[in-house]
Each structure stands twice: as C-alpha cells, then as structure tokens.
Amino acid sequence: MKRIALLATALAFSACSPAAEPPVPAPETPAAEATPPAPSVTLDVLTADGIGPLTLGMTKDEVIAAVGPTRTPDAVGGPEPESCEEFRPERAPEGVLVMIEQGKLSRISLVDMSTVKTDKGLGLGDTADTVKTGYGDQAKASPHKYQDKPAEYITWWKGGPRTEPYVQDEAARGIVYEIDGTGKVGAIHAGGPSIQYVEGCA
C-alpha cells in the first residue's frame, strides 16, 4: 500500500513540473555576399604623358593597382615578356592597351575602335586630314611600313618635331596616329620612344 502511495506522489509531482523548454536554435550566419567587380576606371583623355591614373614610368605593380591585371591571363603579351609585354587591363575601357618595358609603363595604345580620345579630341576613325589639321606643322607624316598610301604614320612630339630618324631619348613624349588603308586612324600610340614600334614590342 505504501508503494502505491509513493508512486502516486511521484506521478503527481511530475505532472506539476514544467515541461523542459526546447533548445533555442543558434542564429544562422548570413552567407557572405559575393564581392562585386571593381568598377572601370575613368580613362577618357589620352595624352603623351598618360591617361587617367596612368603615367608613363609607373611600375607594372602600380599599373595593376590602378587599372587591374590583364583581361586575358593566358595570353602572351610579347616574345620576351620579361623585357617587354602588352596587355589590356581588366578595369580599363575596351581597346586600351598598355606596354610595360623593363618593368615600367612605356606606351599606351588605343585599338579596336576604342572610344577614348586624345587631348586634341581625336580618336579612332578620324581622317588623316583631321589629325594633320589638329596639329598643323607640329606633326610629321611618314610612310606606313606595311601598307601603301593613304596608310601612313602621323607623329607628334612634345616640344616640336624631331630631326633624328629614330628618337631614342627616354624623356621624349609623343603621340603616333596610325592611318590605315582607308585614310582613317586605326590605332593611336602615346608615350616615349616605344610609340615608334610598328609590331607590338618591336
């Protein structure tokens, strides 16, 4: 009889005890948001000294910090990339090509119908006559290496026309307008003596 009384007491106590609360779930950690791509850098006016944040003489690391690495990492930028290479920075506008020689920025080119203009307001697609009018007697025309007229090179150097057949002064700065077989600007190169190259790094 005593056992029955004890069992009844235990059951009554259990019924009066509050039910155990369910464990509180840990707050969910929000998924990390994908890092948005860096915006393109404003590069809208090309001069003989550079464009936007790019200045002739910058190191390759400085160029990459300013406008990003190459858009095409698997492409070879030149036959000897250790001494000279060209690449299209991923945050630069389409058609902007930079040349790195001996680890430093030596030339900036506009190709592939880039919409960037020079400080004279000239760009790809302009006629040779428009370029010559813009510079007057400060620019010099020379035959194109691979194409017949009207293809030619129109070269302008800061400080006036140069008399030497090939400018080697590392401090020289200029712009070359490469005129194609239709008589229009097909490419523009700005920078130091390397603006005279006709085949990439050569």
Question: Could you describe each region identified by the protein language model?
Answer:
Residues 186-189:
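Structured C-terminal subdomain patch of bacterial secreted/periplasmic proteins
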Residues 120:
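Glycine-rich loop/hinge motif
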Residues 16-19:
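Bacterial signal peptide processing site
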Residues 40-49, 106-116:
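Acidic/histidine-rich, surface-exposed loop or edge segments in extracytoplasmic proteins
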